[in-house]
């Protein structure tokens, strides 16, 4: 999509220009995003279902194709109100520039990404607490299943447009097993949101996601990145200190400081963080906010967020 909201022009022989339904079912309407790993399209379900997001591997080789297959495998295994749901998957058989590429069909989130929320306005602390409860609940479910997302950042967190579960985590292409070793020559994550140990190439751990989510929440609440500057400046800064958490954030300060502790053993689990975030939601009776946080295995059960949110137009990231 272009900046003014009009559909980007489709290259000749592309799936968008062909007018031929993908798998005989999904009629591509517009391109929503394009990145180095994939293109994302909005498509109509000709069998009467709601519109969906179609994610097709970018041209370029094995790495891009493997990310799509990896994401499909993760989404097929995990179901949670705050994890985007998988609808279908396959390989593009329509002739043209997309032929032979793997694709997946996902639930279409109808809201903005957190990256767009940060650019547009600073959301209320109550809304952020509501979102955090759902997102940490989703991470707890993922971690209990032995996986780590590895690329938690504003562009990979979406508003769904739904009241009962208003947030979604997307893009599981670089998810990896807990305690696995980094692949030589394969980078994961986004520099400005990596934990210090992820940036140094340590063993994959759930604490990576917890730290990254802490930086995202801090940015939502303050409007600025915790570690600005170039990639190198950002990486060096986090190896020397924890991010600054302004005192004006009040009750958020203890949570944010624990999430972004330099020592990963001092961070809460995602399940504990979900309970801590729930206690920051205004107007929610204490009995509904969850029990006090207790150290232990992340809770794999659903933790749906609730409450009404402003409707925003979807712009999914590739």
Residue ranges, per PLM feature:
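Protein kinase catalytic-loop region centered on the HRD/HxD motif
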Residues: 135-147
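Protein kinase glycine-rich loop
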Residues: 28-35, 40
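Activation segment signature within eukaryotic-like protein kinase domains
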Residues: 131-132
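Short beta-strand micro-motifs within the conserved protein kinase catalytic domain, predominantly
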Residues: 85-100
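Conserved short submotifs of the Hanks-type protein kinase catalytic core
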Residues: 96-113
């Amino acid at each position: 999509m272009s900046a003014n909201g009009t559909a980007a022009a489709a290259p000749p022989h592309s799936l968008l220009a062909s007018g031929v339904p993908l798998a005989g079912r999904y009629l591509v309407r517009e391109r929503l995003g394009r990145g180095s790993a994939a293109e994302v399209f909005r498509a109509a379900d000709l069998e009467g279902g709601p519109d969906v997001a179609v994610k097709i591997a970018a041209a370029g080789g094995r790495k891009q194709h493997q990310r799509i297959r990896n994401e499909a495998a993760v989404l097929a295994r995990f179901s949670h109100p705050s994890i985007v749901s998988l609808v279908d998957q396959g390989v593009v058989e329509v002739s043209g520039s997309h032929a032979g590429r793997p694709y997946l069909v996902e639930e279409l989130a109808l809201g903005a990404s957190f990256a767009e929320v940060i650019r547009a306005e600073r959301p209320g602390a109550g809304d952020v607490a509501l979102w955090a409860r759902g997102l940490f609940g989703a991470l707890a479910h993922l971690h209990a299943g032995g996986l780590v997302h590895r690329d938690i950042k504003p562009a990979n967190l979406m508003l769904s447009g739904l009241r009962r579960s208003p947030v979604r985590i997307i893009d599981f292409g670089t998810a990896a097993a807990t305690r696995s070793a980094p692949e030589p020559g394969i980078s994961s994550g986004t520099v400005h949101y990596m934990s210090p140990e992820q940036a140094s190439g340590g063993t994959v751990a759930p604490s990576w996601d917890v730290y990254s989510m802490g930086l995202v929440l801090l940015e939502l609440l303050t409007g600025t990145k915790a570690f600005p500057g170039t990639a190198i400046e950002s990486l060096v800064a986090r190896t020397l200190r924890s991010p600054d958490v302004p005192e004006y954030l009040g009750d958020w300060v203890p949570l944010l400081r624990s999430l972004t502790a330099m020592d990963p053993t001092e961070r809460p689990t995602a399940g504990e963080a979900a309970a801590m975030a729930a206690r920051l939601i205004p107007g929610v009776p204490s009995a509904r906010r969850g029990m006090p946080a207790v150290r232990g295995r992340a809770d794999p059960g659903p933790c749906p967020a609730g409450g009404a949110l402003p409707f925003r137009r979807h712009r999914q990231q590739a």
